[in-house]
Amino acid sequence: MSSKRAKAKTTKKRPQRATSNVFAMFDQSQIQEFKEAFNMIDQNRDGFIDKEDLHDMLASMGKNPTDEYLEGMMSEAPGPINFTMFLTMFGEKLNGTDPEDVIRNAFACFDEEASGFIHEDHLRELLTTMGDRFTDEEVDEMYREAPIDKKGNFNYVEFTRILKHGAKDKDD
């Protein structure tokens, strides 16, 4: 009997349970969006995000991440990343430390000059052709209140601030 117990302990490490009800932190539509994002990253469809899934997802976006970079991303999780752990990690990021960095860094991946701007046409192309694709109408909606200068440059640093803190009043 004890040999069976010893054998069971050598199997794959099980994901840790979330300590709080992470599903109560988000509404149904947000949870659905997170599920779609999780499924996009879980390239091999095994219900867990691993280093290979991250590599394949980033490669599909034209990136060539180093092993060290991927290890750094994976080390943020205390164990295997199933959907509940994924949601917990996002909940901690959104409600804890500064999520502005995360949002800004997502845009910065496509800002080759590190200027804080992405041309609106290029961003529209990215949003409508990659990942969870936006429709042209959704991009138009996003651009309606977005900080875009006369040359068509989308200021993602300011946009990130607006997302997190709201737009400044016109009177300011």
Swiss-Prot record:
Positions of post-translational N-acetylserine modification: S2
Keywords recorded for this protein, A-Z: Acetylation, Calcium, Metal-binding, Motor protein, Muscle protein, Myosin, Repeat
One of the GO biological process terms: myofibril assembly
All copies of domain EF-hand, residue ranges: 29-64, 98-133, 134-169
A GO MF label: myosin II binding
Region annotated Disordered, chain positions: 1-20
Stretches of the chain forming a coiled coil according to its record: none
Biased composition (Basic residues): 1-16
PROSITE patterns cross-referenced by the UniProt entry: EF_HAND_1, EF_HAND_2
UniProt xrefs under InterPro entries: EF-hand-dom_pair (IPR011992), EF_Hand_1_Ca_BS (IPR018247), EF_hand_dom (IPR002048), Myosin_RLC (IPR050403)
GO CC terms in record: cytoplasm; muscle myosin complex; myofibril; myosin II complex; stress fiber
Disulfide partners: none
Positions with a binding annotation for Ca(2+): D42, N44, D46, D53
Function: Myosin regulatory subunit that plays an important role in regulation of both smooth muscle and nonmuscle cell contractile activity. Implicated in cytokinesis, receptor capping, and cell locomotion.
Other observations noted: This chain binds calcium.
Complex and partners: Myosin is a hexamer of 2 heavy chains and 4 light chains.
Protein name as it appears in the record: Myosin regulatory light chain 2, smooth muscle major isoform
Organism per entry: Gallus gallus
